C-alpha cells in the first residue's frame, strides 16, 4: 500500500490497512498468516510503498481480493539484491547509515550496479525490544557485464 508521511509513521499507518487485509478484511473474510519481513520503500514522489509478503502456499490467483482499495497485490519479479543486516531500533538515522554503507559497498564492485530503490525490511513486531530487532537494507542490483 502507498502511504504518505514521515519515515517512522508510515509503517504504522500502512499496517492498519495491510493488517486489516490479512486479519480478514477481504472479500472472503479469510485470515492469512503474517509473514516477515515488512518492507518499506520510498518512492521518487516522496511517498512510501509498504508491503507484506504472502505465505508461499498462495498465489495471486488463490488470494482473496482486498476490500480496501488502498491495498493492492502484485507478484514481485525475480530480482537480485545486495543486502546488509543490522540489529536495533527503527530510526531513520540507523536505516540511512546502513543504506549508505551498502551503497558504498556496491559502488566498490564495478561488476554490479544499483537497479532500483533501496528497501527497508523489518523482521520483528513492535513489541520486540529494539536491541533484539533484526532489520535489513536491500538494494536491487544487476551485473554490469555478464
Residue ranges and their predicted role:
Residues 1-146:
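A solvent-exposed interaction/effector surface
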